[in-house]
Structures are given as structure tokens and as C-alpha cells.
């Protein structure tokens, strides 16, 4: 039966995709967090493009938290559902205050607005932490 040997059945997929670099072009956990939030229901290519000027101006969570939502919104107008995502990013910056406070465990990540289990597992995987489940993206 297929489900009895699920680990064996997944090995070809794991072998095929193991070691592939994530399509979001980030340099640190802060950038990854922001990009993962923005990429929901949007293309990684779009997020890679629109975040370049944003990260030039806002290099960390502290710089966002010292700003206001009206200042950061124009950077995200080409992102699907940008009003909601912009609010989440601003609220996360206010909550965490610094990049050092970005959680790297599933429970604390999913407690953040805009971060569900899939997004949390992407962040965990990319920061070399233990993940739960298989991360699948269909776009």
C-alpha cells in the first residue's frame, strides 16, 4: 500500500530537489521573513524585484518599526493583498523590534501575523532548523 512506505515513496522527490536554493533572493533571516510574508499568492520573481529598494531603505526590523505604515506601503503596491501584508509586516516589526528577536521555532513563528505553518517551515528550513512536514509550493 502506498501509505505504508511513504518515506520510501518520497525518496525520488527528496533526491530530485535536495540542495536546491530557495527561489527568494534573501541575505538574512529578516529579509527571508519579509519576503515569505509577501510571497503568499504572489510570484517569487515579483517579490525578488520589489524588495530590492525596500531593503535598501529598511535594512532591519528596527528601521521598519521606527517608520510608519504610510512610508512603507508604496514599496508593496505591486504585491497581491498588499494592504494586509504591509500591516502584518509593520505589526511584526513593532512586536519584535530587532532582527535578533525573529523566532526560529514553529510555535512562535505561526504566532506572527501572516505566517502559517507552510511559511514557518520555509523559514525554518532556510535557517537550518528542524521542519515539520513537507513544504510544497504550487505556483
Regions found by a protein language model. Give the residues of each.
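N-terminal polyanion-binding entry modules of DNA glycosylases/AP lyases
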Residues: 1-102, 106
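Catalytic DNA-binding helix-loop module of base-excision-repair DNA glycosylases/AP lyases
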Residues: 33, 37-38, 89-91, 102-139
Amino acid at each position: 500500500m502506498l501509505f505504508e512506505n511513504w518515506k520510501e515513496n518520497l525518496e525520488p522527490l527528496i533526491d530530485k530537489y535536495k540542495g536546491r536554493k530557495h527561489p527568494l533572493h534573501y541575505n538574512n533571516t529578516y529579509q527571508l521573513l519579509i519576503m515569505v510574508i509577501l510571497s503568499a499568492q504572489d510570484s517569487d520573481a515579483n517579490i525578488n524585484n520589489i524588495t530590492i529598494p525596500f531593503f535598501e531603505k529598511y535594512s532591519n526590523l528596527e528601521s521598519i518599526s521606527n517608520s510608519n505604515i504610510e512610508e512603507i506601503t508604496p514599496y508593496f503596491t505591486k504585491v497581491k493583498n498588499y494592504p494586509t501584508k504591509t500591516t502584518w509586516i509593520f505589526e511584526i516589526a513593532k512586536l519584535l523590534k530587532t532582527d535578533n528577536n525573529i523566532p526560529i521555532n514553529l510555535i512562535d513563528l505561526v504566532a506572527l501575523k501572516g505566517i502559517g505553518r507552510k511559511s514557518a517551515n520555509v523559514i525554518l528550513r532556510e535557517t537550518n532548523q528542524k521542519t515539520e512536514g513537507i513544504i510544497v509550493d504550487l505556483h
